[in-house]
């Protein structure tokens, strides 16, 4: 991992002498692959009958998981396909390789030859059957560094019966504790996991999601439709909801802002600098400022990130306009989950 001294010092503030354990842990995937069952549309038992490799979670009744296996041995072939970081991190978990993620192809034979898939920094992450660059599917992965069910291929996922969501992320909706007739706003709603989870827990609340691009809003609406939920979604820069929409007296707000994603794993490699972290910090504070304007007195904010720096977590929520009811951290090397931070804030009267 290529982190400058500022980032390392911040991580050391969190992890102390265990910083190396943390840095090693983010190179590996979570040992469990979680999905959330849409219990408004199906039952846990019915899904488990169709997905026998999954098991019930110990804490959340709507959560099931499959065990991730590996590391596995990757065969090294003369023919190779080199992919970008994001594609490599998916392929190492067993996902197929599609054209947008391919950076270079070195293949001497015909299509349907076996190839090794490499990250762009030279790490072999998978092997499979090469279909050529003429089609969207470039490599059908047959063996990967780690293996888990290919969720994207499941009809249950395509039809809205299940949703891929990490366990740490599932805590957010539960800690929000949505109640009937409350107005709840998700300020950064895409890709929709927390938004739809809130509705699943409390369909009688008024739930509104915002995101700032038309494409993301369209995808959110597609997700909501296939999950058969009644959620409002609008395109907006949610830092200006009060000014642009005159929204006020909201009961609860979720903020899951853009962040450095240091807690996300597995990572093939990563690079972050002081400027990256401080820019995120300033951006994140703007969402909290907007939440203050639209919340009622004693209204609730659940602030969460998939990163672990103090600058993007504790130093964001330390705001004199709010009282911090609690803060929770999940550590990859301790809890075997994504590195994650959640805080519950109350707007002062």
Language-model segment annotations:
Residues 1-204, 210, 214, 218, ...:
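Glycine-rich nucleotide cofactor-binding entry segment
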Residues 96, 244-260, 287, 297-349:
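C-terminal catalytic and target-recognition region of SAM-dependent MTase-like enzymes
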Residues 175, 201, 287, 293-297:
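Conserved helix-to-beta-strand junction in the class I
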Residues 176, 184-194, 250-267:
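Conserved proline-anchored active-site loop of SAM-dependent methyltransferases
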Residues 212-221, 270-294:
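Glycine-rich S-adenosyl-L-methionine
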Residues 228-238:
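Conserved SAM-binding strand-loop segment of SAM-dependent methyltransferases
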């Amino acid at each position: 991992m290529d982190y400058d001294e500022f980032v390392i010092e911040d991580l050391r503030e969190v992890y102390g002498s265990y910083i190396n354990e943390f840095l090693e842990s983010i190179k590996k995937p979570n040992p469990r692959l979680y999905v959330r069952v849409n219990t408004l549309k199906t039952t846990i038992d019915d899904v488990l009958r169709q997905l026998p490799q999954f098991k019930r979670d110990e804490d959340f009744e709507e959560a099931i998981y499959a065990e991730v296996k590996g590391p596995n041995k990757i065969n090294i072939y003369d023919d190779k396909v080199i992919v970008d970081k994001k594609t490599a991190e998916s392929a190492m978990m067993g996902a197929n390789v599609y054209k947008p993620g391919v950076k270079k192809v070195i293949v001497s034979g015909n299509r349907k030859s076996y190839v090794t898939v490499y990250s762009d920094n030279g790490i072999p992450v998978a092997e499979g059957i090469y279909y050529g660059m003429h089609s969207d599917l470039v490599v059908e992965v047959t063996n990967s560094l780690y293996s888990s069910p290919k969720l994207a291929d499941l009809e249950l996922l395509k039809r809205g019966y299940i949703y891929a969501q990490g366990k740490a992320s599932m805590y957010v909706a539960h800690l929000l504790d949505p109640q009937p007739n409350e107005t709840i706003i998700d300020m950064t709603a895409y890709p929709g996991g927390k938004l739809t989870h809130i509705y699943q827990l409390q369909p009688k609340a008024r739930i509104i999601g915002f995101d700032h691009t038309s494409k993301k809003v369209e995808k959110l609406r597609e997700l909501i439709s296939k999950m058969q939920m009644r959620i409002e979604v609008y395109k907006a820069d949610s830092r200006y909801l009060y000014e642009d929409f005159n929204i006020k007296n909201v009961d609860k707000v979720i903020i899951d802002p853009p962040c450095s994603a240091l807690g996300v794993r597995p990572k093939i490699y990563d690079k972050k600098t002081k400027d990256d972290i401080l820019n995120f910090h300033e951006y994140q504070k703007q969402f909290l400022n907007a939440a203050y304007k639209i919340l009622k007195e004693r209204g609730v904010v659940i602030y969460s990130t998939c990163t672990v720096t103090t600058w993007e977590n504790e130093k964001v929520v330390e705001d004199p306009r709010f009282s911090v009811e609690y803060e929770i951290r999940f550590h990859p090397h301790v809890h075997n989950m994504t590195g994650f931070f959640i805080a519950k804030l109350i707007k002062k009267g």
